[in-house]
Structure formats: C-alpha cells, structure tokens
Amino acid sequence: MAKRSPKNEKFFFVYVLGSRSKNNFRTYVGWTIDLERRLQQHNAGVGAKSTRGRKWILLYSEHCKTRSEAMSREWYIKHDRKFRTTLRAIIRT
C-alpha cells in the first residue's frame, strides 16, 4: 500500500458562515472538502436551502482528518450556543 503524501492528503473542513441583513444576523454551520468552492455555492444559491438569497462570509473554519470527525464537530458547533453567540459578538464589534 502506498503512503499518502501531505500534498495528496484529503482534509475535511468544518465551517461557520455569517450573513447580515438590516437588523438580522445569521450563522450557518457545515462541513466540506473544498471550502472555497462551498462558499461560492452558498453565495450562488446552490447551497443549503436555509442559505439561499443571502450574502455569506466565512467566519470560522477548522480542518479534520476524517469525515466522521468533521461531522461530529459540525454537530457540536451547531449545538454549542456559546460558541455561536461569541462569534456574533465578535462580528458586531
């Protein structure tokens, strides 16, 4: 079996997007293998239903080595209100 070199190693990213409209600020959490492409999809209306029709910016990302790890982190971040509240506070300042 050939070893995977760091160049060919696939990483999974967990990310948090932010979008502001008038007096409303929203966040969205997801995971992907191509962060730049995924952000473009969200902004083009091809992303998740809840992200359509908004301009999104990347607020936070982290990489994971496995899909399972990325999915677990996504779940954790989605359910960690303190984390998302902290992000909102940073954006508002």
Predicted segments, located by residue:
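GIY-YIG nuclease catalytic motif and its immediate N-terminal context
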Residues: 1-50, 54, 61, 68-83, ...
